[in-house]
Amino acid sequence: MPPYQIRWLERPEEFERAAEVLAEVWGMRDLRDTIPGHFMRAIADNGGVVLGAFDERGRMVGVLVGILAMDRETGKIYHYSHMLGILRDLRYSGLGYEMKLFQREELLKQGIDLVMWTFDPLRGPNAKLNFSKLGAVCRRYYENYYGELRDELNVGEVTDRFKVEWWIKSNRVSKRLAGEFPTPPLE
């Protein structure tokens, strides 16, 4: 994988570009369907994480957006990782994994030990990243979680989702990330 710079977004134009990248990744024809740049700025400045990945020419090729969250039942504070998008020409390159590792390091600095997010259980590459590479676990399944979405990746599909937990301080996750917790064969 070529070298990419992963860093926090800082300038208004970077947040606006991040909104465009997310729209491109999901095939959102209407920018109202993505997270607005000004809202990403508010997220980044108030406990959330907004990261960009840049290629050697300075082109933004990936975006990760997450917010500080709290479980309503238990009061547990965690990080909710809402969107991770990589431009199509770099999908499956390992960049998404690198962005999640960067996110983990930043959250550990904040004292966060739990990250949660949803994903479509029928998308195999996402399942491999989340379970096999990152070591996330799933305890919840939601039928039609988002309702009808208009982006190209989800239009006309039911939005069933797994909600995964990534315990970023756990020994199991540390071993998975270090390659000491082998993925069982599918045979």
Regions of interest found by a model, annotated:
Residues 118, 128, 132-154:
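Conserved catalytic-core motifs of GNAT/GCN5-like acyltransferases
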Residues 1, 11-24, 173-187:
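A short, well-structured alpha-helix characteristic of acyl/acetyltransferase catalytic modules
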Residues 92-107, 126:
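Conserved acetyl-CoA-binding loop-helix of GNAT-fold acetyltransferases
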Residues 107-120, 130:
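Conserved GNAT acetyl-CoA-binding A-motif
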Residues 4-88, 106, 120, 142:
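A conserved beta-strand-loop-helix scaffold within acyl/acetyltransferase catalytic domains
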Residues 144-177:
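C-terminal "cap" of GNAT-fold acetyltransferases
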